[in-house]
Amino acid sequence: MTKIPEGYRSSLSLYDTQKAIEQVKNVFLTKLCAALKLSRVTAPLIVDPLTGMNDNLNGVEHPVAFDLPNVGKDAEVVQSLAKWKRYALWRYNFAVGRGLICDMNAIRRDEQPDNLHSIYVDQWDWERIITQDERNTDTLEDAVCRIVEAICGTLDELKWHYPQLNTQLSREVTFVTSQELEDLYPTQTPKQREDLFVREHPTTFIVGIGAALNSGQPHDFRSPDYDDWSLNGDLLFWDETLDCAVEISSMGIRVDAETLKSQLTIAGCKDRLKLPFHKMLINGELPFTIGGGIGQSRLCMLLLEKAHVGEVQASIWDKQTEERCAEAGVSLL
C-alpha cells in the first residue's frame, strides 16, 4: 500500500529528476565497475524455461510466460539474472578476479506495488569469479564495502550538482546476522527488526538469508539454487524520506555443488537437478562466483530523496497508488 509522508515535496523538478537519474546511473556504474573489476555485457530479456536459467525468487511468483509460435518454444521474461550470469562468465571465458555487469529489466507480475515495489524491476546485475578458497565471509564483506563506497561516492558527486539534496549516507557498514536480529527482537517481524536495527545503524548488511532461524522461520525466502544461504545477505540504508530501512542490494557467494544439493533438498526442489544449469554446476563446469543485484530505481529513490519508486521509473500502478500520489502532488513518471 502506498503511503506518502505528510508534507513531502520533491527536492527536484521533473526535468532535474530525469537529469539526476542519468547522472546516478552513469556515475555509479563507472565506480562499481572499477571497484569490482567488472565489464558490461548484454543480457537477455527472455529465457527458455527448460534451461533452468530463470530466477525462481521466493518460489511462489509466476514468471511472465508466452509461446513463440515461429520458434517452437516457450519463453519466460526474466525475474533476475542470478543464474544466467554465472553461466555467462563460463561461456565468455572470464578470468578469476574479473566479472560482468548488465542492465536487468524484469517484469514481476505478482509483486504488490507500494512505495518501494513495482511490477517493473530494473537493476544492475553483477557477478565475479572467485576461487574456492574465497568462498568466505571476508570476501563477502569486502564486496559489500566496495559497493557502499561506490554508492557514497556517487552521492558526493550528485550533491555537488544538486546542492538542494540533503541525503546523508554512512560509509561505515554494520554487519549483523539474521539470527542475531531475531535474538535482539524475537517478537518483531523481520521487516520490523530491520527498521529497528537500521535506524541505529544506518548502513547495515544482514548476513544469512534463506535458511530457517531458531524460530523455525527464515528471515526472508531465497531461491535455493544460486545464493549460499550462509554466505549471502541484504544491504540496507536508512531512508530519512520514508523513515524506514530500504534494501538496495541482495547479494552473496553462490552455491557450490554440495550446497546446491543440500539447499534443494531442504526446499523440496531436487527435481531441478535435472535442468541443464544445475547439471553443469554439479559437474563442476561452472566457476565459483559472488554476485548480486543492485536496484537502479531504489538507488535513485534513496539518493534523490524520493517518496515513491514511480517518481524515478515508468510503470503501471493500481488506482489507490495513483489517487494517493495525486492527492500529495507526487508526479508519477
Q: Model segments located where?
A:
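Extended, charged alpha-beta segments that form solvent-exposed binding/catalytic grooves
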Residues: 102-188, 192
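Generic recognition of stable, solvent-exposed alpha-helical segments in well-folded globular domains
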Residues: 16-19, 23, 27, 135-142, ...
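A generic secondary-structure signal for well-formed alpha-helical elements
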Residues: 32-40, 147-158, 307
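N-terminal pre-domains immediately preceding structured catalytic cores
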Residues: 48-54, 168-176, 318
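A translation/RNA-centric and nucleic-acid-associated enzymatic feature enriched
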Residues: 107, 178-333
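Class II aminoacyl-tRNA synthetase-like tRNA-binding/catalytic domains
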Residues: 1-117, 125-129
